Amino acid sequence: MEISIKNIFEKADFYLGKKIIVNGWIRNCRFQKKLIFIELNDGTFLENFQIVYKNVDLEKIKDILQIGTSLKVEGFLKKNEKQEKNLEILAQNITLLGSSDFSYPIQPKKHSKSFLRTIPHLRTRTKLFGAVFRIRSTAFFALHHFFHKKGFFHINTPIITPNDGEGAGELFQLTSLNLERLSQEKPSTINYQKDFFGKKVFLTVTGQLEAEAMALALNKVYTFGPTFRAEKSNTPRHAAEFWMLEPEMAFCDLKQNLKVAQEMLQEVVVQCLQENQKDIEFLDQTVRNGLLQELKNVVQEKEFLVITYQKAIEILASSGVAFENKVFYGSDLATEHEKFLTEKHFQKPVFIIDWPKEIKAFYMKNNPDQKTVAAMDLLIPRVGELIGGSQREENLAVLIEKMQQMKIPQKEFEWYLDLRRFGSCIHSGFGLGFERLLLFLTGLDNIRDVIAFPRTY
């Protein structure tokens, strides 16, 4: 029977003594007279599996069994009490599936993460990145499972959009026009009416606005997909292409929004601790000492702390720390501020609510003081901002006034304003940066290491 290495470790008693077949890649190989010890891994589990091959002609087979070679192994599962991992396969037959040679860049030694970033197509074959992307898979499924269980409908929002939903202006523009030919014309002009859509279009920075439209029909929805920002920031926290999870809920206020965000985060952490225990223990030992306890602490937190933006500014201003970015009311929080609050002051996750309306998006609901909005940011240790959201402005007149104040062209958003014209209601939502969640789950500190094929500045 053909089984995975993960199944062998999980159901060893069942397979013990039985003839089994495993496929995988050689991670290491040792030769002793007429005996070969092969460390095989098929990607399903952190640990390699030992294959013992006896009575073989080493001269014929030695050059074939190179690191990276793929094999099919048939043999009997047995115990070896002398080994720490006391399971092994006594091979009867080994079939070469795909050869490798000495130029294979991943050898049985420690490679730096910076080197492995130069070979993203191969780095997942290492123990480190195998663990990372198994955790990524678990977290992805756990998010879908959480919202399905809570009665949310999964929706798909467009990748191509004419709108800058965040108002940030950092967009990748798309065109089907021959720009090389147009650039040679005198004068050089581009008529977007001749373009595919007859106007300027961009890669999306958020699916939120469309998700709001769906929520005001289906009650509770979420979208989960790639987003794009042409932000020229070469930092460990920024990528040009990344994944965003964005739930939107009708008849939901800011307080309920906070509750959903906390429950979601805790459930994802629980699922990863259960399904990827070995991977997380390995990362705890090799990447970040204390990672396992940090994750458990988040799960055990009964209710995340909630403070106002004003309180956060007061704490930072009175801290005595000489921050590189000056702290004052009306300033956005920099990474150093977020980390001080979560790692030094509170030493745990914290929601910051009631932000000055001048530094938040036009769609966020004004508070009664008319100076702040019902916005929330969830800050967590090491990562900083993980979630950003708000109660949305449901009042048509107020929303139009805010758009005018921010010089946002109303014509392009008439469809969005229709949501307030016809059956408007309170509604809320948030955005979760999936890769930032993975930084927290894995203990890594560079977003390039939690995306299989990163696209960065």
Swiss-Prot record:
Keyword Aminoacyl-tRNA synthetase: yes
Family matches, as InterPro entries: Aa-tRNA-synt_II (IPR004364), aa-tRNA-synth_II (IPR006195), aa-tRNA-synth_II/BPL/LPL (IPR045864), Asn-tRNA-ligase (IPR004522), Asp/Asn-tRNA-synth_IIb (IPR002312), NA-bd_OB-fold (IPR012340), NA-bd_OB_tRNA (IPR004365)
Any Pfam family hit: tRNA-synt_2
SUPFAM superfamilies, sorted: Class II aaRS and biotin synthetases, Nucleic acid-binding proteins
GO molecular function: asparagine-tRNA ligase activity; ATP binding; nucleic acid binding
Subcellular location: Cytoplasm
Keyword presence, Transcription regulation: no
Entry keywords, A to Z: Aminoacyl-tRNA synthetase, ATP-binding, Cytoplasm, Ligase, Nucleotide-binding, Protein biosynthesis
GO BP, sorted A to Z: asparaginyl-tRNA aminoacylation
Main location: cytoplasm
GO CC terms of this entry: cytoplasm
EC number: 6.1.1.22
Catalytic activities: tRNA(Asn) + L-asparagine + ATP = L-asparaginyl-tRNA(Asn) + AMP + diphosphate + H(+)
Family, per entry: Belongs to the class-II aminoacyl-tRNA synthetase family.
Assembly notes: Homodimer.
UniProt-recorded name of the protein: Asparagine--tRNA ligase
Species lineage: Bacteria, Bacillati, Mycoplasmatota, Mollicutes, Acholeplasmatales
Gene: asnS
